[in-house]
A protein has these predicted regions:
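C-terminal helical "tail/cap" subdomain of flavin- and related membrane-associated enzymes
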Residues: 323-418
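FAD/FMN-dependent oxidoreductases across multiple families
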Residues: 226, 242-324, 332-333
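Glycine-rich FAD pyrophosphate-binding loop
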Residues: 29-49
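Predominantly flavin-linked oxidoreductase catalytic cores and closely associated redox partners
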Residues: 116-264
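Beta1/beta-strand and adjacent pyrophosphate-binding region of the FAD-binding site
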Residues: 5-20
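A conserved beta-strand/loop capping segment in the N-terminal third of enzymes
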Residues: 58, 62-112
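Conserved hydrophobic helix-helix packing surfaces used for dimerization/oligomerization
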Residues: 12-14, 35, 293
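Conserved Rossmann-like nucleotide-cofactor binding loop
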Residues: 20, 43, 167
């Protein structure tokens, strides 16, 4: 629906139609709410992303009814991890989650999940950029939008869900603040034609070298998109903190990494559609909720500090936030919900990610970690967000214990109120 035909009021207004926002709109509509799903873009549109879908993300897509659809795309068995003289093929562990992952370009994925939201009853609103809010005391009563002609209009709402991505412009209006004292990501990706677009393993190179051969605190990836696509998503990501900035030229690094993989992956031609982004990670944001509004997905910093993945968290938070709708005040309830689901894991993960930015840590720890298949299997499970509260094995118990201890040491735990 174009902005000119926008409804003047709704029960639930969702701003941002990525995976998180569209999931929230779908679940809210299925729960019987009147929903408007707004986005600044006109779909289909691209987003900077590695396009990888972990088994946890596949499980959420199953719940939305997209299981058959996603399995009709690339299907991978696990991770091929390489670096420091070693290479391992590490299958997804299965168990509570599917034993496979996928990779779907965001242009296609986001459009399809948005269709599910619309089919569930949400009203779409395209080309509408949220620029301000109206309030009555501590409640948001309406969002002010601008259309393509810079004409303003408003949509009144009883509940507001903000899913406008890593930059979260509407979140900033509402008081969201990103704290860069813990690790954040600096990443770039593009697409290349590859003779191995149907490879059954996503690949990560954990010994990422800069254009001068220097070791960087990050990794490179190659995610096959399937034989029909004929392409792979190729990218690089590094970690940084306010004290230890990344200091890399992403475009040059992406080109160098692509050239290094060219023969191995039978890559032809230049990188297509290169794009980059900064990624707040591990709940390193404050101001994620108010009386009748909440931030979800990337806007809330729900990104894994160890690999930059956020689609599964986006889909989950889009589903979980609907449980708040009967509460009168979300300002404390939503941060508490996020901490309950992700706080411990985010705390220890961003602490480990911060260590990787220390110059001497990775050269010492990298070769030791890559030597052990058992250790890398544990790393896959942790990096893939595949440890749940229901798991009772040694790895799960150790990870949760480490997370609880880490939170106690945090100056600013994940999802702090201010």
């Amino acid at each position: 629906m174009p902005a000119a035909a926008a409804p003047s009021a709704t029960d639930v207004l969702v701003v941002g139609a990525g995976p998180a926002g569209s999931a929230a709109a779908a679940w809210a509509a299925r729960a019987g709410h009147d929903v408007v799903l707004a986005d600044a873009a006109v779909f289909p549109r691209d987003k900077t992303c590695g396009d990888g879908l972990t088994p946890r993300a596949i499980a959420e897509l199953d719940l939305l009814g997209l299981g058959d659809w996603v399995r009709g795309h690339a299907r991978n068995r696990g991770l091929r991890a390489a670096g420091f003289g070693h290479e391992w093929q590490l299958p997804w562990p299965g168990g509570r989650f599917p034993d496979h992952g996928s990779a779907v370009p965001r242009t296609e994925l986001d459009a399809r999940i948005r269709e599910v939201a619309i089919d569930s009853g949400a009203t779409p609103l395209d080309g509408a950029r949220a620029v301000d809010v109206e309030r009555d005391g501590d409640r948001v009563t309406a969002v002010v939008f601008e259309d393509a002609d810079d004409e303003q209009f408003r949509v009144a709402c009883r509940r507001l869900v903000v899913a406008d991505g890593v930059r979260s412009p509407l979140g900033r209006v509402l008081g969201r603040e990103w704290h860069r004292d813990t690790a954040f990501g600096v990443a770039a990706r593009g697409y290349v034609t590859s003779g191995r677009s149907d490879d059954e393993w996503i690949s990560s190179h954990l010994e990422l070298r800069g254009v001068e051969g220097e070791l960087l605190s990050g990794y490179g990836w190659v995610f096959p998109l399937g034989a029909a696509a004929g392409e792979v998503n190729i990218g690089v990501g590094t970690l940084a903190t306010a004290r230890r900035p990344a200091g890399v030229q992403l475009k040059a690094l992406l080109e160098a990494y692509t050239d290094a993989r060219r023969e191995e992956w039978q890559i032809h031609g230049p990188v297509r559609a290169p794009a980059s982004a900064l990624l707040p990670m591990g709940g390193a944001v404050s101001g994620v909720a108010g009386r009748n509004w909440a931030l979800i997905g990337d806007a809330a910093g729900c990104v894994n500090p160890l690999n930059g993945e956020g689609i599964d968290y986006g889909l989950e938070t889009g589903r979980i936030v609907v449980d708040l709708f009967d509460d009168d005040d979300w300002s404390a309830a939503w941060p508490a919900t996020l901490r309950r689901h992700y706080g411990h894991a985010f705390s220890i993960a961003r602490r480990l990610a911060g260590l990787l930015t220390v110059p001497r840590f990775l050269p010492a720890a990298g070769p030791v970690g890559m030597r052990s298949r058992a250790l890398m299997t544990v790393a896959l499970r942790v990096m893939g967000n595949l440890v749940t509260e229901e798991d009772r094995d040694v790895v799960a118990r150790a990870w949760r214990t480490a997370g609880r201890l880490s939170v106690k040491l945090d100056d600013r735990p994940p999802f702090t109120a201010k």
